Amino acid sequence: MPIVTLPDGSQKTFDSPITVMQLAESIGTGLAKACVAGKIDGVPVDTADVIEHDAEVSILTPRDQEGLEIIRHSCAHLVGHAVKQLYPDAKMAIGPVIDDGFYYDIDFGQSVSPEDLEAIEKRMKVLIDHEYEVIREYVTKEQALATFIDRDEPYKQEIVEGIADGETVRLYHHEEYIDMCRGPHVPNTRHLKAFKLTKLAGAYWRGDANKPMLTRIYGTAWADKKALKTYLKRLEEAEKRDHRKLARKLDFFHMQEEAPGMVFWHPRGWTLWQTVEQYMRGVYKDSGYQEIRCPQIMDVSLWQKSGHWDNYAENMFFTESEKREYALKPMNCPGHVQVFNSGLRSYRELPVRYGEFGGCHRNEPSGALHGIMRVRAFTQDDGHVFCTEEQIEPEVTAFHRQALAVYRDFGFDDIAVKIALRPEKRLGSDDNWDRAEEALRNALSRCDVEWEELPGEGAFYGPKIEYHMRDCLGREWQVGTMQVDFMMPTRLGAQYVAEDGSRQAPVMLHRAIVGSMERFIGILIEHYAGSMPLWLSPLQAVVLNITDAQREYAESVTQRLQKSGLRVKTDLRNEKIGFKIREHTLQKIPYLLVVGDKEVEAGAVAVRTRSGEDLGSLSVDALIARLQEEGV
């Protein structure tokens, strides 16, 4: 006689074990119709799972985030069903859930076109209309292996072979199609109607460039057609804001095959970069950081001592010279320790804070590269604090407040704070990790801020606070970090003279606010759709003459504005004024300053904004005052 406790605290008693679906039916037909899965004592389960003992049970529907993820996972299986009907020789790999959707990696043995994607989506809709039951089956490892050998699915075979002997495997049957998964999955395809396949991409099997290149089919799925439509509209807007397209249009940067994952900055883009860098340089100064510069290439022995060799070598670039092996730095921290070690420090000097706009190189897989959001060569606003254990909390607290102020200045107010906790592969003792994680929690508590904890997501040398910005489209971007590290100073021999005269290893705090400068600028471009705030705009105004008669005056206005510290140029081309206005509006220049005979006579300019607003005639002095005030 199981007693079931529901989320609202109410209880239901049954004479015999019941399934999750039967429980839903006992509550109401509407709930049963919407039920996609359940949770028994917090564990997600299929609707066919049996409640055999007293338990806390909740019914999952498409309105629940977990229910929505189950729908997305089931849609990935539906992709497999449709693909195998249309392309029987295709080999299925993996199909996980991702943010806002899912994907399936498939070896088609041929190129796949957008027309193929449309055909697969069309077949999925036909299968959904069948409203067939999704059947779960428990089998042994040997039975699962036999199933996929019989179906000539080598990638599935490889996955099964990696499962521990004696472990039970779940198979899910979509009519004649069989897939494997931990589940749970929807009980019927009628729950999958609000979906859309979005794009094709390439991906190496297991992320290994030495293994076959597969076709990745991306898709999204939602609770209903209205939510799907809203998301697709957001996706369309994101496409318009794609920083790669805007960069070409606005002449910010380009990338090319000869330097994959590396950026060719153009004058306007580099001006934007320098504006961000100079702002962050001011943050260094205001926060008591001394700016330093370290080598790009260092002997591998340093990386072996730091722990990067054992934990990060696959992501590093190497080179040789005169029979010595060197590595391009993937991180700045070991170099900063060398600067700290260059002299004997006293406890009275701590905390010592170093900052560097440090260029790093990481050997990211080619399939993971994405414009300037994911690159192989990048620069960080990196900083490291060498301090005592007692100084951790005040340093982290000060950093937290500084980071939030920076994000506000760049136009981001919606910031989620998360603590990434110890990963399975890590350096140091559990005691060190306990103290480091608790120090971060205590610092955030002092700031009266809520946070989410991410088990297993910390770096190999320490836990970290992550700052996630939400942009105008509701997308979340992880930018800043603050990391506690007890290990690296010891490994690299960092010491200070303590108050009692003993030699002690300092604690090292790794911090960055914007993180990768390239990525942060990409986020800014997309957040503002290229229409940067005045202070960030590479070109803040353009002076446009109507005829050659105003050439000299236009040049004098430009010179006055430039001497005032504004980024301005003159457009003296023999083109119609309407053409010039339109061209610079499309270039998203904040202010267009038109000068004709009337403006020359009055010593003024006619001011228009990129949004089309006519601000009328302003004297040059009044204009300078306005722009300087807005650009602060």
UniProtKB/Swiss-Prot annotation:
One Gene Ontology biological process: threonyl-tRNA aminoacylation
Binding of Zn(2+), residues: C333, H384, H510
SMART domains: tRNA_SAD
Cellular component, GO annotation: cytosol
Cofactor(s) in the UniProt record: Zn(2+)
Domain spans labelled TGS: 1-61
Region (Catalytic): 242-533
Record's function text: Catalyzes the attachment of threonine to tRNA(Thr) in a two-step reaction: L-threonine is first activated by ATP to form Thr-AMP and then transferred to the acceptor end of tRNA(Thr). Also edits incorrectly charged L-seryl-tRNA(Thr).
Protein family according to the UniProt entry: Belongs to the class-II aminoacyl-tRNA synthetase family.
Name of the protein this chain belongs to: Threonine--tRNA ligase
